[in-house]
UniProtKB/Swiss-Prot annotation:
Residues spanning the signal sequence: 1-18
UniProt KW Hydrolase keyword: yes
Cysteine-cysteine disulfides: none
Glycosylated sites: N271, N420, N603, N629
Binding site for Zn(2+): H437, H441
Primary residence: secreted
Protein name: Probable extracellular metalloproteinase 4
Needed cofactors: Zn(2+)
Organism field: Arthroderma benhamiae (strain ATCC MYA-4681 / CBS 112371)
Length: 643
């Protein structure tokens, strides 16, 4: 998963949202290549709501549904004019993934261009408030000199096939591309190609000519896309020196059902029960239809779940349980072995947990417009065709899990493994926290920077927060009625057979039990280690809001909202964290993400929880005076005036 990390083992890089794995599948050789050394630079800026310059002139009104007598172009025009005013000399294009979220904020994203070519790691996101004015914005546009020579005139760049070979050779990719067999077929867009005649990748590799912002300048590069299973890579190969790789992004982050019900994290917390019609009314009707068919198996609009013992990429024809009566009840006990003997129960549990989480997130705002995972978007916005592919007992590894998040319109892919630290071995599908952790990688990658941009958590601190968000949601969902702020939680305890879980510290509001502070991130190179710090801050936030607003009935699945605002502190924390993801810039750092959460609360509740939020972050060193620096962060316990 972009997620769970076993102590003492190396974490997987970037977006392989994964725990370290004993993998025998295709992928980048970790011993030969450390792709984390090719991370994108962290250059984004975020202007929070109270720092946005005063605006004059006409505005429009958004609504929580975007259905007012207002055309979608109004807020896009406002955002475009803001960009023109802020950076009058910039050239850019509008990314076609703008939407008005359920919180009433319009989200608009732009990509900088030079000579009509994308500068691929430059983004400008504008958030338009309910009053029709700019609420906040993020910016990573290049402000240096644009190359005067247009490379398209003299065709001053290599053939894309050579760039593909450069990526394969430099990163030691398990892809075969013999020159006599490979053809670069043009597809829609300028200098955009799909390669035919290769083998080893899960889909045809692609290449697009782009600029990359690096070391204070622009380098012309081929962006080569290769999905090799454990890694789904964007490799930026120099357009002239094809043996030089400038950067790498990895999209992968390491009826009736008899299941462990929602809120039961693993078999130690409760028993399996039969649940009838568990889906929430979220416009998806039920989990087994997609507008084209009704499937009496673990397939539907949101997900398709199956076993995958070979670890191969094919999934359509893999085994999945079938029930003409839609009764998915199968035997399972902790003593059963081998795992294949309870594959039906495993697949059913994975399908159930993922679909419930999809529905909860939908109510909290991660819907079609925001880039969620659905085959059919029911004419509600976004791009369909992208349910989540869920592989139970995936044979490509053990002691791990991962989730790959391509842009909106392409299916996400979750691989759940078995864990062999106990006898008999354990199946990660039965630990809900692992499933939720992995799926949350898809959520944070789709929300940050817009649904069409899946590289916005590719920097070190951004990727760390991706791990932290995943741990946070997995923990918030498993709260029990008797829990208090004195309750501590682990991650991955059951599957790994480790009483203290797989993080350095338990999640706790006690600085004795968990002493993590912001400055602890200095010198860390693991996204999992950095993520534990971020999740520790969010755990403080969770309990500050619960102490103020209550937990609600944690035995109920459906969040209760009043005027779009969750009535309990648990779901309120989840909501403003989700909204903050959509507000923050591409490649955010801790300080920017904190400010985006404060802005999310300001928009949602008029800032009524400002002090609770500040106290959570300041307790762990992310107070008013905190400042980001890659190697030397500044910690602060200072609170703003009035708190």
């Amino acid at each position: 998963m972009h997620g769970l990390l076993l102590a003492g083992l190396l974490a997987l890089p970037l977006n392989v949202l994964a725990h370290p794995t004993e993998s025998h599948s295709s992928g980048v050789s970790r011993r030969a290549i450390d792709i984390t050394s090719y991370r994108l630079p962290q250059i984004s800026k975020y202007t929070k709501s109270d720092a946005v310059p005063k605006q004059d002139g006409e505005s429009f009104t958004t609504s929580s549904t975007g259905d007012d007598n207002v055309s979608s172009g109004d807020y896009v025009t406002t955002a475009t004019n803001w960009l023109k005013k802020t950076l009058p000399k910039a050239t850019y294009r509008l990314v076609n993934d703008h939407y008005i979220g359920d919180s009433g904020i319009g989200h608009v994203h732009f990509r900088q261009t030079a000579h009509g070519i994308d500068i691929d790691n430059t983004d400008f996101n504008v958030n338009i408030g309910r009053d029709g004015k700019v609420f906040s914005f993020g910016n990573s546009f290049y402000d240096g000199e644009i190359p005067k020579a247009n490379p398209m005139v003299k065709r001053d760049f290599s053939d894309p096939v050579n760039a593909l070979h450069g990526a394969i050779q430099t990163l030691n990719l398990p892809v075969t591309a013999k020159p006599e067999n490979v053809k670069a077929k043009p597809v829609e867009g300028k200098e955009n190609f799909k390669f035919e005649g290769t083998s080893g990748a899960l889909s045809d590799p692609k290449a697009q000519l782009v600029y990359l912002q690096k070391d204070g300048g622009l380098v012309l590069s081929w962006k080569v896309e290769t999905d090799v299973g454990d890694n789904w890579l964007l490799t930026y190969v120099d357009a002239n020196k094809n043996d030089q790789v400038h950067s790498v992004v990895d999209y992968v982050s390491a009826a009736e059902y008899q299941v462990y019900p929602w809120g039961i994290n693993d078999p130690t917390e409760g028993n399996r029960t039969s649940i009838h019609l568990p889906w929430l009314k979220t416009l998806s009707t039920d989990w087994h239809i997609d507008g084209k068919g009704w499937y009496p198996t673990t397939r539907g609009n949101n997900a398709i779940a199956q076993e995958n013992p070979t670890g191969h990429p094919e999934y359509e024809n893999n085994y999945r349980p079938k029930s003409p009566l839609f009764i998915f009840k199968y035997p399972y006990s902790l003593a059963m072995t081998p795992p294949s003997s309870y594959r039906d129960a495993s697949i059913t549990q994975l399908f159930y947990t993922t679909n419930v989480y999809h529905d909860v997130l939908y109510i909290l705002g991660f819907n079609e417009k925001a880039g969620n995972f659905q085959i059919n978007n029911w004419n509600k916005g976004g791009v369909g065709g992208d349910f989540a592919i869920l592989n139970s007992q995936d044979g490509s590894g053990v002691n791990n899990a991962n989730f790959a998040t391509p842009p909106d319109g392409q299916p996400g892919r979750m691989r759940m493994y078995t864990w062999n630290a106990s006898t008999p071995e354990r199946d990660g599908c039965f630990e809900a926290g692992i499933v939720i952790h992995e799926y949350t990688h898809g959520v944070s990658n789709r929300l940050t920077g817009g649904p069409e941009n899946s590289r916005c958590l590719a920097a070190l601190e951004s990727g760390g927060m991706g791990e932290g968000w995943s741990d946070f949601f997995a923990t918030a969902i498993r709260l029990k009625p008797g829990d208090t702020r004195a309750t501590d939680y682990t991650m991955g305890e059951w599957a790994s057979n480790r009483p203290n879980g797989i993080r350095k510290y338990r999640y706790s509001t006690s600085l004795t039990t968990n002493p993590h502070m912001y400055v602890d991130a200095d010198g860390l190179t693991s996204v999992h280690a950095i993520g534990t710090i971020w999740a520790s801050m969010l755990y403080e936030l969770l309990w500050n809001l619960i102490d103020k607003h209550g937990k609600g009935d944690v035995t109920k699945i459906r969040p209760v909202l009043k005027n779009g605002v969750p009535t309990d502190g648990r779901h309120l924390a989840m909501k403003i964290v989700l909204d903050g993801m959509a507000l923050q810039p591409c490649l955010p750092n801790f300080v920017q993400a904190r400010d985006a959460i404060l802005d999310a609360d300001k928009n949602l509740t008029q800032g009524s929880n400002k002090c609770e939020i500040w106290k959570a972050f300041a307790k762990r060193g992310l107070g008013v005076g905190a400042a980001f620096n890659q190697t030397k962060r500044t910690g602060s316990n200072e609170l703003p005036a009035g708190c």
